[in-house]
Swiss-Prot record:
Family: Belongs to the transcriptional regulatory Fis family.
GO terms of biological process kind: regulation of DNA-templated transcription
Record keywords, A-Z: DNA-binding
Residue ranges of DNA binding: 53-72
Protein name (record): Putative Fis-like DNA-binding protein
Length: 77
């Protein structure tokens, strides 16, 4: 069972995804999920960090340069 609201939301979304496949085999689910969550995650954390990249990187537990690269990849800089 889900331990928190985020996990529950992901589980519910994946259940819907699998039901909507209508018998087709899924592919690249891991990449699909990561791509779907990364941009809103970055946007939300940057908002909570008042666009301070060092603080946002700390919140995410990643290096500031890694955060900057991800922000650029998503066109958020």
């Amino acid at each position: 069972m889900s331990r928190n609201p985020i996990e529950r939301c992901i589980r519910d979304s994946l259940d819907t995804y699998y039901r909507d496949l209508d018998g087709e085999n899924p592919s690249n689910v891991y990449d699909m999920v990561l791509q779907a969550i990364e941009r809103p995650l970055l946007e939300t954390v940057m908002e909570w960090a008042s666009n301070n990249q060092s603080l946002a990187a700390d919140y995410l537990g990643i290096n500031r340069n890694t955060l900057r690269k991800k922000l650029q990849q998503h066109g958020l800089l």
